[in-house]
């Protein structure tokens, strides 16, 4: 089903769905809550279920500690009898609550609005005791500490938003509907106090490039510390030393014993009983689990653990109340501290040491006992069955689809989390393999229901196409295929739940295995053949083949189970695969093996039958064709090219490229069929009626637009040539179409900030990253051609201008011979004709203001940086794959010294490796990185770049690259977390920093081996000594905080959210604003329920909704949601990700729309600081941003600040685009307008001259923009001359009348000093009359100027009338 069909189906489901019936739940709580006869009221609906009620109870403060209870309706336990997924509508129907008693016989129904529910506590068992303890830990905040301690990285989910200190969102002042002409003209001028304007102007001065914090790592990593203000309300709560409960106490109802230490430093021993919790008489040395009663007969017992601790510790309740106050005071946005739901948080590559903390908690080591069940069996899950069962849930209604998507996302994340944690332990050597006799790259593991293998375990299948490199590559492509099948929701065939973990240079592929695939086949009772031999006793029995469709495990047969054809055909249709026959050449017998019928997928895609009865598909990497053009050109197996060959021959084309090729081919077929019908006269005009039944259907033969996935996958000469040509056509399509179109479009696009954004942009365009070198080369060609074209254009326009000047000169000479009266009449006539012509039609300017040159240069720089950082990642992987984990930090630091510190120390030494460490690894492993020098690393990187990207770096590339940005990219690619400090990347910075650090040198501990001199026998002892070191290069091993795993998983973007979003947008487009906004509000809740609050998808969706709100004029709502989007992007995508930068920019725009300009400037400043870290201080986007900011400042008449921003934008654009560019000319023109407002007419004349010169050269003398600027040049020039003459005249009069003061005309504004004389109603042409210039040119916005230039009417001006 196509996406359009799914959207239509969703719309139909929403239209068919009954309006939501509201329901009020009146919940009676257990008596120990002491609420009397009062009911707890919870708003709900008929569609919600018991699980939703339990979730609501978990949130409500009064009853959030309740975990072990029954839900009774009419005295019947609902969960026990019906389960948690039963809806209230089903409950009402089952109990016939909707029928009136007096009308039961007639069967008449009524809609009830209230439902009474009774919550009854249950007796505890050990499992529910564990659940109660877990809930207690969560309520008091220990789950925050648990996450920090057990996280896969440091400081996950940081944010800086609260540190910006924005003012509260305020509604705009209501504007009158009716306004006078003067108000209409001044609508852009806002009523803001002088004090606020002064604050805004002062803050705007920070927008010069020198003030950006891009290279100040310490400033940029000052993250919010919200959780640090939360105190733990107890000292500790642990499972007591007296646990487990002995048999003689089990019969008395004891379940577990706890030890509690309060903030008052008291220790209590607690018995967990089936009836609740109570303090017992045990101590550290005496066991007595009976209830403790003091001399007054008082004892402490409660059904809830939380209530018991409240009784025992007054500071407990007080601290929890203070925590709530501290959280609310610290931030207005709960998104800042909420824990991520169905995703990992973003882990920063720079970590502030002050944020690293470890809180003491004795119970943390006992968590596995609490959360994995009473016998630990809950840790082992049947992931495959759980997730496949969820996928098989019904999807007939929108609500069912939402529930299904929610469960899928939750289960997939739990799988990814478990798999990642185990993979890290595997890489660290903490888990033994199942096959220890094999080589380490062949190790396999089976742990907690997940099968683990290295990314190179299938290397034997790719001996001829790259071995290990090919194996790693196809593992990622297999995951991509799984992800697409999951998203498309193909039924009848199941894919494996998969994720890939790269950690410290090693890869682990994690999969939930096909049920039964790892089982050893059971041999049945032996049978006897005709000769009396026992068949089961044959010494060499063949292994049981688990594959039933596709290539067999040993590659000798092709299996064709007919039951797999139909479900696999769905996959073939989705990926546009061509049914085809396959022929193999058998190595043993020499006979060819052929398929009997067509395979609907690649032979390498295998079908298996699980013991659960499901059909499974594996090895989905061959769902796109091989990039045969690239492979043939760059992958060479011979010895001569081995050093320079591309690493593997399994290069595959991206699905986006195949889909684009398919769409274009289908469009050609559609056009052809349409033309054929038109030719036959079967297509009638739109105005003619035609029966729907007789209406001609255009049948597009899409089965013609397919490809053979096995083409070029072997040396078989029997492959059909047409199949090969189709694959070759798709391969050529990338270079000939996709890359060229991408480069043509990039002139108008926002250039990526970093490598991750570049990767996403190229992938969306269907371009593989191996083409980076080719794209870089094409950019150079495009840039050179642009410069040549620009030079020719300038020459052409200069020639036109010269010709026009000559024509005007001739005309002036001719007019000089005419009489003055004739000349004046002729001028009046020409002016009238000119004004009439301009009024009738004004040709829009040809100016596009494209940042072509800047975009080409910027993109080229990012591509070079990306190629280098990716190459370094592969070098580091090879360098560290055989090193023990404790030496990897040392190796990484030394490599970075060699790479970045060439100017500081070209031959850095690896110092301070403890002697004892050296005994744990081989000498060859140590020497693999110890002997590296700067020159070695530069050569390694250059070689790797050429090998992987077919691009030759310049010999001095290290001097042309931006080192801080490359440093960041490498950290992301490999997964390194560095200590946040300002690293010196130049010799000057290094020497300055070393001189500053002489007083506080770095202290490190070294284990040294020393010989004893006192003893006669020479004995060696190891001693720990602390040494002060002075850095000899940039980095040391201690600068590395840790490593984080790079995780690729099979989770996908929910389709139901996208479909409802498209439906909501369509309602808005059709003018149904109320329905559209209702759907958007509902969508926010749906999105959060599926993904969780802190999730990248939720963050991006908040951005979308804020944009929609702003478009509809809901500025306050847009500003609020925009702020939340920033926080969620920071915490889930990364504080310096391009998503976060975009969110900051959007949020700044929403604040500006809400007329809170100081807030807007603060957000823009944070965005610029971040992208100066990510890219540098000269990204092309900065030009537009500064220009737009100047517009905002002009609205509040902060002219000086607006001028400073435009001057900064001018310097950047001159650097990036050159002096002669449209955008440079436009900024000159804009600055000149502001300078006029500041009464600096001489300076404005110079600026207008520069703008005119640029536009004349680029647009020609006849362009409307050139003419417009020419008018300003003439107007301001004449006025400057007028002022000069007036000043001279005043001086002469002063000299003549030295005793008399003469009043001079004020020169504060062009409008007040300009006068005009008329003769017979006509303008006088006398030289001593100042020109009539436009007094509002400085107050016009850029959009208004452009509208005026393009001939469009402006709302703030009257149209010119012919005099």
Swiss-Prot record:
GO terms for molecular function: mRNA binding. It comes from the Eukaryota. The keyword Ligase does not apply. Residues 361-631 form the Clu domain. Residues 799-832 have a biased composition (Basic and acidic residues). Disulfide bonds: none annotated. The keyword Transmembrane does not apply. Residues 172-191, 521-544, 799-844, 1291-1363 are annotated as: Disordered. Keywords: Cytoplasm, Repeat, TPR repeat. TPR repeats lie at residues 29-63, 120-154, 283-316, 548-581, 1057-1090, 1141-1174, 1183-1216, 1225-1258. Residues 833-842 have a biased composition (Acidic residues). Residues 1330-1342 have a biased composition (Polar residues). GO terms for cellular component: cytoplasm. Transmembrane segments: none annotated. It is found in: Cytoplasm. One of its GO terms (biological process) is mitochondrion organization. Its main location: cytoplasm. Pfam families: CLU (PF13236), CLU_N (PF15044), eIF3_p135 (PF12807), TPR_12 (PF13424). May associate with the eukaryotic translation initiation factor 3 (eIF-3) complex. Belongs to the CLU family. mRNA-binding protein involved in proper cytoplasmic distribution of mitochondria. This is Clustered mitochondria protein homolog. It comes from Candida albicans (strain SC5314 / ATCC MYA-2876) (Yeast). The gene is CLU1.
């Amino acid at each position: 089903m196509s996406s359009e069909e799914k959207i239509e189906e969703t719309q139909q489901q929403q239209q068919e769905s009954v309006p939501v019936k509201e329901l009020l739940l009146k919940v009676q709580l257990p008596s120990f809550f002491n609420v009397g006869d009062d009911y707890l009221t919870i708003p709900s609906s008929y569609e919600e279920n018991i699980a939703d009620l339990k979730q609501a109870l978990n949130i409500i403060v009064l009853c959030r500690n309740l975990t072990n209870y029954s839900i009774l309706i009419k005295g019947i336990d609902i969960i026990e009898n019906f389960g948690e997924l039963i809806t209230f509508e089903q409950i009402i129907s089952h109990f016939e609550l909707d029928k009136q008693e007096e009308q039961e016989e007639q069967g008449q129904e009524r809609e009830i609005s209230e439902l009474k529910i009774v919550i009854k506590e249950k007796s505890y068992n050990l499992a529910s005791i564990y659940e109660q303890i877990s809930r207690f830990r969560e309520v008091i905040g220990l789950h925050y500490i648990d996450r920090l301690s057990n996280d896969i990285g440091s400081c996950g989910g940081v944010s800086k938003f609260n540190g910006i200190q924005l003012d509260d969102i305020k509604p705009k002042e209501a504007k009158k509907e009716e306004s006078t002409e003067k108000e209409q003209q001044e609508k852009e001028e806002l009523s803001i106090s002088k004090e606020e304007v002064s604050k805004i102007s002062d803050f705007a001065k920070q927008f010069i490039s020198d003030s950006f914090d891009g290279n100040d790592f310490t400033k940029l990593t000052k993250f919010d510390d919200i959780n640090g203000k939360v105190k733990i309300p107890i000292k500790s709560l642990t499972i007591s030393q007296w646990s487990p409960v002995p048999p003689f106490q089990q019969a008395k109802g004891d379940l577990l014993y706890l030890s509690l230490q309060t903030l008052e430093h008291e220790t209590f021993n607690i018995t967990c009983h089936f009836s609740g919790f109570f303090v017992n008489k045990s101590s550290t040395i005496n066991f007595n689990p009976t209830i403790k009663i003091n001399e007054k007969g008082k004892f402490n017992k409660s059904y809830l653990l939380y209530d018991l601790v409240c009784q025992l510790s007054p500071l407990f309740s007080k601290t929890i109340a203070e925590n709530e106050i501290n959280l609310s005071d610290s931030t207005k946005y709960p998104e800042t501290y909420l824990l991520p739901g169905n995703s990992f948080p973003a882990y920063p590559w720079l970590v502030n040491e002050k944020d690293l903390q470890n809180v003491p908690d004795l119970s943390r080591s006992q968590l596995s006992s609490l959360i994995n069940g009473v016998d630990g069996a809950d840790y082992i899950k049947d992931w495959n069955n759980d997730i496949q069962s969820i996928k098989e849930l019904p999807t007939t209604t929108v609500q069912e689809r939402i529930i299904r998507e929610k469960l899928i996302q939750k289960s997939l994340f739990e799988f990814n989390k478990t798999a990642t944690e185990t993979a890290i332990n595997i890489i660290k050597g903490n888990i033994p393999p199942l096959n220890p006799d094999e080589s380490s790259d062949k190790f396999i593991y089976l742990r907690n229901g997940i099968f683990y293998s290295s990314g190179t375990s299938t290397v034997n299948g790719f001996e001829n196409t790259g071995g290990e490199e090919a194996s790693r590559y196809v593992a990622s492509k297999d995951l991509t295929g799984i992800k697409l099948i999951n998203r498309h929701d193909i039924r009848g065939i199941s894919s494996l739940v998969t994720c890939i973990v790269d950690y410290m240079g090693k890869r682990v592929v994690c999969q939930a295995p096909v049920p039964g695939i790892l089982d050893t086949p059971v041999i049945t009772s032996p049978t006897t053949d005709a000769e009396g031999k026992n068949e089961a006793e044959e010494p060499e029995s063949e292994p049981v083949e688990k594959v039933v469709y596709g290539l067999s495990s040993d590659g000798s047969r092709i299996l064709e189970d007919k039951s797999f054809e139909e479900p696999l055909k769905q996959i073939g249709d989705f990926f546009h695969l061509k049914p085809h026959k396959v022929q193999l050449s058998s190595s043993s017998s020499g006979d060819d093996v052929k398929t009997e019928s067509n395979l609907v997928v690649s032979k390498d895609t295998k079908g298996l039958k699980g013991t659960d009865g499901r059909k499974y598909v594996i090895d989905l990497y061959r769902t796109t064709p091989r990039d045969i053009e690239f492979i043939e050109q760059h992958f060479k197996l011979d010895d001569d090219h081995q050093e320079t060959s591309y690493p593997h021959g399994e290069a595959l084309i991206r699905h986006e490229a195949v889909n684009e090729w398919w769409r274009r081919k289908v469009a050609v077929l559609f056009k052809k069929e349409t033309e054929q019908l038109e030719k036959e006269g079967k297509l009638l005009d739109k105005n003619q009626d035609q029966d729907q039944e007789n209406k001609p259907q255009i049948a597009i033969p899409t089965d013609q637009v397919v490809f053979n996935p096995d083409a070029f996958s072997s040396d078989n000469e029997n492959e059909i040539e047409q199949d090969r040509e189709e694959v070759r056509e798709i391969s050529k399509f990338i270079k000939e179409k996709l890359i060229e179109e991408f480069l043509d479009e990039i002139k108008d696009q926002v250039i990526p900030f970093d490598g991750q954004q570049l990767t996403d942009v190229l992938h969306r365009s269907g371009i593989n990253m191996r083409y980076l070198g080719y794209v870089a080369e094409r950019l150079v060609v495009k840039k050179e051609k642009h410069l040549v074209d620009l030079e020719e254009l300038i020459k052409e326009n200069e020639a036109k201008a010269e010709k026009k000047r000559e024509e005007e000169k001739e005309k002036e000479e001719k007019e000089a011979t005419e009489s003055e009266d004739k000349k004046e009449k002729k001028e009046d006539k020409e002016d009238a004709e000119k004004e009439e012509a301009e009024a009738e039609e004004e040709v829009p300017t040809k100016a596009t203001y494209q940042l072509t040159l800047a975009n080409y240069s910027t993109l080229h720089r990012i591509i070079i940086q990306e190629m280098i950082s990716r190459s370094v990642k592969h070098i580091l992987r090879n360098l560290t794959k055989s090193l023990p984990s404790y030496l990897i930090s040392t190796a990484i630091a030394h490599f970075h010294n060699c790479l970045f510190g060439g100017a500081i120390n070209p031959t850095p030494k690896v110092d301070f490796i403890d002697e004892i460490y050296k005994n744990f690894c081989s000498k060859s492993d140590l020497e693999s990185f110890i002997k590296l020098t700067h020159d070695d690393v530069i050569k390694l990187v250059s070689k790797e770049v050429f090998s992987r990207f077919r691009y030759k770096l310049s010999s001095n590339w290290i001097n042309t690259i931006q080192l801080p940005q490359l440093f960041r990219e490498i950290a992301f690619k490999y997964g390194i977390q560095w200590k946040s400090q300002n690293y010196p990347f130049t010799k000057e910075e290094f020497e300055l920093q070393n001189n500053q650090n002489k007083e506080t040198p770095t202290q490190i501990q070294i284990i040294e081996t020393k010989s004893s001199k006192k003893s006669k026998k020479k004995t060696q002892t190891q001693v720990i000594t602390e040494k002060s070191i002075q850095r000899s290069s940039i980095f040391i091993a201690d600068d590395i905080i840790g490593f984080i795993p790079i995780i690729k998983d099979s989770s996908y973007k929910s389709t139901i959210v996208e479909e409802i979003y498209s439906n909501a947008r369509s309602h808005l487009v059709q003018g149904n604003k109320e329905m559209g906004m209702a759907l958007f509000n509902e969508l926010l809740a749906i999105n959060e329920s599926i993904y969780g609050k802190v999730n990248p998808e939720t963050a991006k969706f908040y951005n979308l909704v804020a944009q929609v709100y702003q478009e509809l004029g809901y500025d306050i709502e847009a500003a609020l949601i925009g702020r939340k989007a920033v926080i969620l992007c920071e915490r889930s995508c990364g504080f310096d990700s391009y998503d976060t930068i975009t969110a900051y920019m959007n949020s700044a725009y929403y604040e500006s729309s809400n007329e809170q300009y100081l807030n807007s400037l603060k957000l823009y400043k944070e965005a610029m600081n971040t992208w100066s870290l990510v890219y540098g201080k000269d990204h092309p986007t900065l030009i537009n941003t500064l220009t737009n900011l100047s517009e905002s400042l002009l609205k509040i008449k902060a002219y000086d600040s607006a001028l400073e921003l435009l001057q900064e934008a001018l310097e950047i654009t001159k650097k990036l685009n050159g002096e002669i560019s449209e955008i440079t000319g436009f900024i000159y023109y804009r600055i000149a307008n502001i300078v006029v407002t500041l009464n600096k007419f001489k300076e404005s004349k110079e600026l207008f001259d520069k703008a005119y010169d640029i536009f004349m050269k680029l647009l020609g003398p006849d362009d409307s923009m050139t003419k417009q600027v020419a008018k300003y040049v003439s107007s301001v020039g004449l006025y400057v001359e007028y002022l000069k003459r007036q000043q001279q005249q005043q001086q002469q009069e002063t000299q003549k009348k030295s005793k008399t003061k003469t009043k001079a005309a004020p020169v504060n504004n062009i409008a007040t000093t300009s006068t005009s004389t008329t003769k017979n109603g006509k303008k006088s042409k006398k030289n001593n009359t100042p020109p009539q210039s436009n007094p509002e040119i400085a107050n016009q916005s850029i959009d208004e100027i452009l509208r005026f230039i393009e001939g469009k009417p402006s709302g703030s001006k009257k149209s010119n009338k012919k005099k």
